A protein has these predicted regions:
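N-terminal export signals
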Residues: 7-26
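Feature activates predominantly on carbohydrate-active enzymes
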Residues: 27-229, 233-236
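Catalytic-core regions of glycoside hydrolase
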Residues: 101, 165, 184-188, 196-370
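Secretory targeting signals
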Residues: 1-3
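Short, cationic motifs built from Arg/Lys/His that form the positively charged side of catalytic pockets
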Residues: 5-6, 43
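Hydrophobic beta-strand residues in large extracellular and virion-surface proteins
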Residues: 8, 35, 117, 304-306, ...
Length: 375
């Protein structure tokens, strides 16, 4: 984290032609198969006072436990990095062993942003360390792509800016950080922006809950997408916003955005694939997501490029079900790949599975891909 802003800009000056390079990479991209892995994890929960007031290590947390959130359990937000280097490398190496070619890296508090060093926590990776790992990942035949979640229900990694959403200060920070990341990643072909689950039900466990809707949500989304595009990458985002209102989503979502529909169940029956508009206004409960499977068909039929995501979060059979569905029902010209998201911090197993759940998720997804999309 010793890199100054001036040094950082100087070191990346040779990438000034990245707009062309990034777009060329996106246009000539392979069929992606990979996973979302967590370097940062402050995308859930938040803090009652200052973002740096919590324990700075796992050892300190034993005597200074995290505060209880409104959900009744300790907040999952941490003032230190929840990623162990050896387990991170083990996860990436498993992707390589399974012949995956894509890893979305959920960054959050995981890396230093030269424009905003205040976003670091104890253990945050320096720019130099991040670049070294990106080079190692590429040497394994895997394209590392960044992910930052700008959903107001998943953006506690922004620290105090998490509480300044839609302000001029916020917009500047968004632009600064995206520029930093595109430079660190050397103009990645894809840049995942998250933007999922920005609904009232998702904020019930937060100390500070806010969500955008209507024109403001669209303004902020399109502003964020523009920052990605001006830095030479293609924006990727979760597409569950369609569940709030299909017609409005299809009317306003640009086709340049690569949509990532997700569904972690196994029910791809015709009944479950039929859109039920009655769920669109139920964003006070998780029933609002009852059209997740149906959204694949809606987006496919509307002509969007898709990068679907599965997970072993709740069902080990989910990868097989989703990959099989993609193979038989989605337009191959619009399907840009498939990936899995185990949704685990990169830490040792404790009372719950963490690293083992991640590795199992990669294995389950690889088996499904080998069956339906053999290399």
């Amino acid at each position: 984290m010793k890199t100054t802003r001036r040094e950082f800009i100087g070191a990346t000056a040779l990438a000034a032609g990245g707009l062309i390079a990034g777009n060329a990479a996106a246009q000539g991209s392979p069929f992606y198969r990979g996973a979302l892995l967590h370097l940062g994890s402050n995308m859930w929960g938040d803090y009652p006072a200052g973002p740096d007031d919590l324990a700075k290590s796992a050892e300190e947390e034993k005597t200074h436990p995290n505060p209880i959130s409104p959900s009744g359990s300790p907040t999952p937000y941490h003032s230190y990095l929840q990623c162990r280097d050896d387990l991170w490398r083990q996860s990436v190496d498993r992707l390589a062993a399974k012949k995956m070619n894509l890893v979305f890296i959920d960054l959050g508090e995981g890396i230093a942003y030269p424009s905003h060093p205040e976003l670091a926590v104890a253990g945050t990776w320096s720019v130099e360390k991040t670049r070294a790992e990106l080079a190692r990942i590429r040497s394994l035949g895997i394209e590392p792509m960044p992910k930052l979640n700008f959903s107001t229900c998943h953006d506690s990694w922004l620290k105090d800016y998490h509480r300044m959403v839609s302000s001029q200060t916020y917009y500047k920070v968004v632009a600064d950080i995206i520029a930093d990341v595109c430079a660190i990643f050397d103009k990645p072909a894809l840049f995942h922006l998250g933007f999922d689950e920005e609904v009232p039900v998702a904020g019930k466990g937060l100390f500070h809950a806010v969500y955008r809707q209507g024109d403001l949500w669209w303004h902020d989304l399109l502003y964020t997408v523009k920052q990605v595009e001006r830095n030479g990458s293609r924006a990727v985002m979760w597409s569950d916003k369609i569940c709030d209102g299909r017609e409005a989503f299809l009317a306003r979502m640009p086709k340049d955005v690569l949509l990532s529909p997700w569904y972690y169940g196994t029910n791809f029956s015709e009944k479950n694939l039929a859109w039920d508009a009655s769920y669109e206004k139920k964003n006070g409960t998780w029933e609002v997501q009852r059209n997740l499977a149906a959204s694949f068909v809606a987006l496919n039929d509307a002509g969007y490029d898709l990068l679907p995501c599965t997970s072993n979060w709740s069902r080990d059979e989910a990868a097989e079900a989703l990959v099989s569905f993609c193979k038989t029902r989605l337009d191959p010209k619009r399907l840009k790949g498939i990936y899995t998201a185990p949704w685990q911090r990169t830490i040792p197993d404790d009372k719950k599975k963490h690293i083992s759940k991640t590795l199992e998720g990669i294995d389950l997804f690889a088996a499904a891909m080998d069956k339906h999309y053999p290399l």
